[in-house]
Each structure stands twice: as C-alpha cells, then as structure tokens.
C-alpha cells in the first residue's frame, strides 16, 4: 500500500499480512481523497481515523497537512500504527480503545471523522455510530465518512448526504 499525495506521497507502507483488516484499495482511497480535497483544504484540519486498521487513511490525511488521531482496539493494528508513525518521524496520538467508548468520553470536535468498522456491523451499530459522531464529535461543518460493504444502505438516515461505490466497497458521507 502507498500514500498517494502530500509530504509522504509515493511512500510505500508495508502492512503485515497477519493484521485482521481489509485495507482500502489505492484506487478507492485516491477517489475519496479527490472528493474530500474538492470540499476543503486539509491543512491544519482535525481528523479522527477510527477503526484505523492499518492507519493508511490517517496517514494520507497527515501527508496532506491534517492533525490526525487514531483510534484502534486491536493490539496488532495499534502496534503497527505506532511503529509506522515512528518510522515516518511522526508523533500523532494513537488510542488503543473501543471506538464507541473513546467517542463517548472524548470532548474533542473534529473536521472529519473517518470510520471503517468491521463489515459484520449491524445496521443498529452503524446507526448508533453515526448518531454519536454527528451529534457529539463533529464540528458543525464537519463530515463523517464511513467505509462499508456495498450492500449496506444508509440513505434513509437523516444525516446521510451522499454515497460513492468502488467495487464491493462503498463510502457514505454524513453531516
């Protein structure tokens, strides 16, 4: 996997095969970041990369000038993110925590929150996550982006704004 643009653009990040993740493809990541950068300049924005997995989405935001925190429960993923940040000479905060617990107790507000929960999440879990983030953790002009399996449809949720599909992977945007 690689970082697409910015300070670390073109840099390859080795993701161990034993991590319990499904990394976002470079094509999907590039497409999503084209959408995001058309909406705003990412420099100095506060970003939360939740259910971080490999940390590649957060690293892409960092490379483009954003201030990013990572929230990941899995110890192997957590250690990988910490190691990768160290290799890049970065000191961003990485929280080893359940995402719901972190968000419920955090008083931080973010410009963007990226969430890539397990595909086995139920509709109710997605709904709980969306409501929590939009009502508590996003700035008033902030945006929540959820990566999910294509079969999931969130268009009936009032905070839903748009959806983009890339193969079996979809991204839904909420405000």
Language-model-detected regions and their locations in the chain:
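Class I S-adenosyl-L-methionine-dependent methyltransferase catalytic core
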Residues: 1-175
């Amino acid at each position: 996997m690689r970082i697409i643009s910015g300070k670390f653009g073109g840099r390859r990040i080795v993701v161990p095969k034993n991590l319990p993740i499904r990394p976002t493809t470079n094509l999907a990541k590039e497409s999503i970041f084209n959408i995001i950068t058309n909406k705003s300049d990412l420099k100095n924005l506060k970003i939360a990369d939740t259910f971080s997995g490999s940390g590649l989405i957060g690293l892409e935001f960092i490379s483009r000038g954003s201030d990013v925190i990572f929230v990941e429960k899995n110890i192997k993923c957590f250690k990988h993110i910490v190691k990768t940040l160290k290799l890049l000479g970065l000191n961003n905060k990485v929280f080893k925590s359940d995402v719901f617990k972190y968000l419920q107790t955090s008083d931080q507000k973010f410009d963007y929150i990226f969430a890539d929960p397990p595909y086995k999440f139920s509709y109710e879990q997605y709904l709980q996550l969306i409501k929590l983030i939009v009502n508590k953790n996003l700035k008033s002009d902030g945006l929540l982006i959820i990566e999910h399996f294509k079969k999931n449809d969130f268009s009936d949720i009032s905070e839903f704004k748009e959806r983009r599909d890339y193969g079996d992977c979809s991204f839904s945007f909420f405000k």
